[in-house]
A protein has these predicted regions:
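Short, surface-exposed loop and linker segments with low hydrophobicity and enrichment for Pro/Ser/Thr
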Residues: 6-7, 29-40, 111-118
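Short N-terminal secondary-structure initiator segments
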Residues: 17-31, 73-82
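Solvent-exposed coil/turn segments that connect beta secondary-structure elements
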Residues: 47-49, 60, 127-131, 139
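Short, exposed beta-strand-loop hairpins at the edges of beta-sheets
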Residues: 112-136
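Mature extracytoplasmic domains of secretory-pathway proteins
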Residues: 52-119
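Hydrophobic transmembrane alpha-helix bundles
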Residues: 31, 81-87, 137-140
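N-terminal export/targeting and maturation segments
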Residues: 21-66
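Sec-dependent N-terminal signal peptides of Gram-positive bacterial secreted proteins and lipoproteins
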Residues: 1-24
Length: 140
């Protein structure tokens, strides 16, 4: 019985940690990203020969809560919230996102913006304000 209680307590703690607010960003900062780049949701995963998820970055702007997450295993960087948003917007500066861009152009620019020239795979999901979501998968 004691073991069962300990197990349930451990599961609850893990669930609470997973549901933390560490990825949250202030509404004004999320709105600024949408106003500047026109992006309401962005998720990219870049894989290399060495690692299938060498880079993961995501930004999502919603009325009730906006979030950002950034992980670059090549550089040993794992950021959440405003720090992650800063890294992502630095990449957006280089990317110059365009909702009318061709898929191959988006892939190429995304790899360059996140400084991954040696990628094997890129999975990109992006939603521009007023446009349908684009989901692109590219493997070499």
């Amino acid at each position: 019985m004691k073991k069962m209680f300990s197990f349930i307590l451990l599961i609850q703690l893990l669930m609470m940690a997973a549901c933390s607010d560490q990825n949250l960003i202030p509404k004004d900062k999320a709105s600024k990203v949408v106003d500047t780049y026109g992006i309401t949701a962005f998720t990219v995963t870049i894989g290399t020969k060495e690692e299938t998820e060498a880079l993961k970055a995501s930004f999502i702007e919603k009325k009730e809560r906006s979030e950002a997450e950034f992980s670059n295993n090549k550089q040993g960087v794992n950021l959440h919230g405003e720090k992650a948003l800063k890294k992502i917007t630095e990449a957006f500066e280089k990317l110059s996102p365009d909702p009318e861009a061709e898929e191959t152009e988006l892939i190429k620019k995304t790899a360059e913006a996140f400084e991954f020239k040696d990628y094997q795979m890129i999975r990109l999901e992006v939603t521009f304000k007023g446009y349908d979501s684009k989901e692109i998968m590219f493997s070499k």
